[in-house]
């Protein structure tokens, strides 16, 4: 029971931090159920980036230096399962649900740079402001 209270306190602190960042200025928040936390704001673009399982496992192997595919798959499954459970606990919805997103992108098709460019273009179209133009210059 004590663990659940600690978890809820951490989640509450996370909600506060994400709202503080969003209130302060334009920002990019990766994960942390930010689509749910910022769901009542009009100035948010919710994007879910995904890739086929084999590409995600290959990324785990590269990033963590794991040479055994079975071990990399176990690592990926463990993290993926925890992320799904955490998101569902907080939101009551499945992670990656298209109904809470403006955009879903398979990053394996375009690669990271073109995926980023696509998101920047979407920001520009949705908000029609200079932040997207500045991001393009920095990319």
Protein language model annotation of sequence segments:
Residues 126-139:
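C-terminal helical "lid" subdomain and adjoining coupling/linker elements of P-loop NTPases
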Residues 40-63, 70-78:
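Conserved phosphate-donor/acceptor-positioning beta-strand/loop module used by diverse small-molecule
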Residues 15, 112-120:
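Short, amphipathic alpha-helical "lid/cap" segments that border enzyme active or binding sites
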Residues 1-26:
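ATP-dependent small-molecule kinase phosphotransfer cores
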Residues 21, 34-41:
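RNA pseudouridine synthases
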Residues 68-113:
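Small-molecule kinase domains that catalyze NTP-dependent phosphoryl transfer to phosphate-bearing small molecules
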Residues 34-36, 51-56, 109-111:
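Conserved nucleotide-binding/hydrolysis micro-motifs of P-loop NTPases
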């Amino acid at each position: 029971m004590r663990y659940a209270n600690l978890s809820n306190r951490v989640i509450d602190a996370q909600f506060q931090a994400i709202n503080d960042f969003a209130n302060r200025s334009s920002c990019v928040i990766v994960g942390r159920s930010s689509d749910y936390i910022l769901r009542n704001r009009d100035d948010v673009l919710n994007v879910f980036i995904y890739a086929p399982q084999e590409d995600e496992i290959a990324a785990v192997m590269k990033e963590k230096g794991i040479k055994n595919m079975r071990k990399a798959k176990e690592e990926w499954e463990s993290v993926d399962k925890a992320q799904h459970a955490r998101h569902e606990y907080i939101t009551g919805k499945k992670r990656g649900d298209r109904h809470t997103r403006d955009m879903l992108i398979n990053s394996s098709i375009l690669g990271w740079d073109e995926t980023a460019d696509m998101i920047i273009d979407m920001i520009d179209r949705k908000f029609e402001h200079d932040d997207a133009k500045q991001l393009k210059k920095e990319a």
